[in-house]
Amino acid sequence: MNHLGDIMKNSLKVEPIENGTVIDHIKQGKALNVYNALDIKKDKTITIAMNVPSGKNHKKDILKIEGIELSKYDVDKISLISPNATINIIKNKIVINKFKVEIPNTIEGILKCTNPNCITNIENVAGKFDVEGREPLKIRCFYCEKFLNSIEVYK
């Protein structure tokens, strides 16, 4: 291999961020869902990496957002899309906090009930769900008690 090939082989494919958030271990193919769920301002520098090798025969997605620290609400949204994601808070190119997302016991204001007769679809009431199971995901509407599974939640 020539010198340029050696440099390319040993270099990073994506620049590290100075300050912001890296969402790692996003389920393969879900990075755009996470990006869309976060409603990030258009002036932010964002890197989306999809189908990145991760361990033996596994792939993951990664989302890097410069200048953003996520709220608990945002982290809860991510947990519903990719329950094994990891959040890294970066300051001056150093990881100052790293944690795995967790599906909360109660989900409020993130989802709407799929029951057309539920009060959340008739009046201006935010959706509220109790988590009944995590693997696989199963949630119950607080108001009408309709169950939703992971397929309905991840749409």
Swiss-Prot record:
Assembly and oligomerization: Contains catalytic and regulatory chains.
Record's function text: Involved in allosteric regulation of aspartate carbamoyltransferase.
Cited Pfam families: PyrI (PF01948), PyrI_C (PF02748)
Gene: pyrI
Keywords, comma-separated and alphabetical: Metal-binding, Pyrimidine biosynthesis, Zinc
Matching Gene3D superfamilies: Aspartate carbamoyltransferase regulatory subunit, C-terminal domain (2.30.30.20), Aspartate carbamoyltransferase regulatory subunit, N-terminal domain (3.30.70.140)
Cofactor remark: Binds 1 zinc ion per subunit.
PANTHER family: ASPARTATE CARBAMOYLTRANSFERASE REGULATORY CHAIN (PTHR35805:SF1)
Cross-referenced HAMAP family: Asp_carb_tr_reg
Gene Ontology MF term list: metal ion binding
GO BP annotation list: 'de novo' pyrimidine nucleobase biosynthetic process; pyrimidine nucleotide biosynthetic process
Cofactor section: Zn(2+)
UniProt protein name: Aspartate carbamoyltransferase regulatory chain
InterPro entries, A to Z: Asp_carbamoyltransf_reg_N (IPR020545), Asp_carbamoylTrfase_reg (IPR002801), Asp_carbamoyltrfase_reg_C (IPR020542), Asp_carbatrfase_reg_C_sf (IPR036792), Asp_carbatrfase_reg_N_sf (IPR036793)
Native species: Methanococcus aeolicus (strain ATCC BAA-1280 / DSM 17508 / OCM 812 / Nankai-3)
Binding site for Zn(2+): 113, 118, 141, 144
